[in-house]
Swiss-Prot record:
Keyword tRNA processing: yes
Identification of the protein by name: tRNA uridine(34) hydroxylase
Enzyme Commission no: 1.14.-.-
Lineage, uppermost ranks: Bacteria, Pseudomonadati, Pseudomonadota, Gammaproteobacteria, Pseudomonadales
Chain positions covered by the region annotation Disordered: 282-312
Any GO molecular function: oxidoreductase activity, acting on paired donors, with incorporation or reduction of molecular oxygen
UniProt xrefs under Pfam families: Rhodanese, UPF0176_N
Organism encoding this protein: Pseudomonas paraeruginosa (strain DSM 24068 / PA7)
Length: 312
């Protein structure tokens, strides 16, 4: 049995004292050997962490001791090696950045749809199904029939909706994302924009993959995740993708055969667009990573591009 538990969690809840929560939360993570990144904002908490079974249980016991977080849910998967390099708790304006004032999932959200009911909803021809994730995530897997907004960050989602859809014509809208947070916030935005019947997948793609048998699944491909596994398959086992440190795009087995793929430095997606300064920085970064690996030391550089997607 694998020893590392990976827990994805979020909850929209008003945390007026979120600044004061940072230090005790960080200490709880450190005391229990839990790694990863958690985001705190006045609107709630979001993140993905990993550790031993005991460490993860201790973290959630601490979180749930706060009445505001007593019902916080999370999704678990498992791996053989620690997928995070560092332990961080960041203070943010939003736990997932949409950038539209007044959007508040604590006050208004769409209708939650359980994983077991999702297939029936998205099979309805009157339902517009939108993938709220970024383009590089959608490229490696999505639901059958889903629209790809081709956004590079969640901040672009509102403009995409304004440019393509009309509440008067698009009566039913269903949305999904990796763990549920982006589509929940998107549903709040959509309601504010005048859309009336707005649905979103409770627990996101990860909950769907966990609960729906593969033979009944309408999911196609792998699912991008926010840790060093890069992707997971339908059974939540680690996929075969790597990730380019320069552009953050997932890199397939085929991509790694390209002459433009240099581990840690470039891939076929970004080779033509990299400046020499960026290449030089990437080479130095990769050199430090390899030296740390040879010494069996933690990742030497504080910021891992994989974790930045939490905020976008």
């Amino acid at each position: 049995m694998t020893s590392i538990v990976v827990a994805a969690l979020y909850k929209f809840v008003t945390l007026d004292d979120y600044v004061a929560l940072r230090e005790p939360l960080l200490q709880t993570l450190l005391d229990n050997g839990v790694k990863g990144t958690l985001l705190l904002a006045e609107e709630g908490i979001n993140g993905t962490v990993s550790g031993s079974r005991e460490g993860i249980d201790a973290l959630f016991a601490w979180l749930r001791s706060d009445p505001r977080l007593a019902d916080i849910e999370h999704k678990e998967s498992y791996c053989d090696e620690q997928p995070f390099y560092r332990t961080k708790v960041k203070l943010k304006k939003e736990i997932v950045t949409l950038g539209v004032p007044g959007v508040d999932p604590n006050k208004r959200v769409g209708q939650y749809v359980e994983a077991k009911d999702w297939n029936a909803l998205i099979s309805d021809p009157e339902v517009l199904l939108i993938d709220t994730r970024n383009d590089y995530e959608v490229a490696i897997g999505t639901f059958e029939g889903a629209v790809d907004p081709k956004t590079r960050s969640f901040r672009e989602f509102p403009e995409y909706i304004k440019a393509h859809y009309d509440p008067a014509r698009h009566k039913k809208v269903a949305m999904f994302c990796t763990g549920g947070i982006r589509c929940e916030k998107a549903s709040s935005y959509m309601l504010g924009a005048g859309f009336e019947e707005v649905f979103h997948l409770r627990g996101g793609i990860l909950k769907y993959l966990e609960e729906v048998p593969q033979e009944q699944s309408l999911w196609r491909g792998d699912c991008f995740v926010f840790d060093n596994r890069v992707t997971v398959r339908h059974d939540l086992s680690e996929g075969e993708y790597d990730q380019c440190h320069a552009c953050r795009n997932p890199v397939s087995v085929e991509d790694r055969q390209s002459e433009h793929y240099v581990p840690g430095i470039s891939c076929p997606h970004c080779w033509d667009s990299l400046s020499e300064k960026t290449r030089a920085g990437a080479r130095e970064r990769q050199k430090q990573i390899e030296l740390a690996r040879q010494r069996n030391q933690p990742h030497p550089l504080g910021r891992d591009p994989r974790q930045s997607t939490l905020e976008n």
